[in-house]
């Protein structure tokens, strides 16, 4: 009888530890998967906006697009989270990485961003993306950046990067963690 109880105890213990590891894995992987999905849609957006700049050839239209989108009344209930504003920004550089337009921080215009990974790699014809913190001590202050090349006559003449604060996505992650 004693052997049966000990065996049963170890079976329950092993199953409990396995279940705990599974839940722990799912919870840890959830944020990573959510950020991957966000990055994927940012790649699309960056390329659409880069194509727009190639087609239109002016910054005025790009500025107007962002101004209009920031002034829209948004009430989108997405998985129990209410979205009320556009959380995506973009900047455009020339072929040297100098900022020509920044929808979120116009004071950056004229700054050299060529050292940043999203710009440097995109201008070199590769996939350029990065994540940077606005406050090194706060892991929730990360901002995701994804670049797309702007072409003219077959040459890369600039980079259009879209950027989004990870804090915009974290409420979805937290809600899913509660659900799990």
Predicted segments, located by residue:
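Juxtamembrane membrane-water interface segments immediately C-terminal to a transmembrane helix
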Residues: 14-17, 25-51, 69, 175-179
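Short N-terminal helix-loop-first-beta-strand/juxtamembrane motif that initiates sensory/input modules
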Residues: 77-99, 127
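Helix-start (N-cap) segments at beta->loop->alpha junctions
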Residues: 136, 151-153, 161-178
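A short beta-strand signature within small-molecule sensing/ligand-binding domains used
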Residues: 139-149
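Extreme N-terminal signal-anchor transmembrane helix of membrane signaling/transducer proteins, especially
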Residues: 1-26
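Extracellular/periplasmic ligand-binding regions of membrane signal-transduction receptors
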Residues: 36-72, 95-100, 104-105
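Glycine-rich acetyl-CoA-binding "A-motif" of GNAT/NAT acetyltransferases
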Residues: 156
């Amino acid at each position: 009888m004693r052997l049966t109880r000990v065996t049963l105890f170890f079976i329950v213990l092993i199953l409990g530890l396995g279940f705990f590891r599974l839940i722990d894995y799912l919870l840890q992987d959830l944020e990573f998967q959510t950020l991957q999905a966000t990055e994927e849609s940012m790649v699309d957006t960056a390329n659409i906006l880069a194509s727009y700049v190639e087609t239109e050839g002016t910054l005025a239209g790009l500025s107007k697009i962002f101004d209009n989108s920031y002034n829209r009344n948004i009430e989108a209930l997405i998985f129990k989270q209410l979205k009320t504003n556009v959380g995506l920004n973009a900047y455009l550089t020339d072929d040297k990485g100098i900022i020509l337009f920044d929808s979120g921080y116009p004071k950056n215009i004229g700054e050299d961003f060529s050292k940043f990974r999203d710009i440097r790699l995109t201008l070199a014809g590769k996939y350029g993306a990065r994540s940077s913190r606005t406050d090194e001590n706060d892991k929730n202050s990360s901002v995701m950046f994804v670049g797309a090349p702007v072409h003219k006559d077959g040459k890369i003449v600039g980079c259009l990067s879209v950027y989004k604060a990870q804090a915009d996505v974290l409420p979805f992650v937290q809600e899913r963690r509660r659900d799990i």
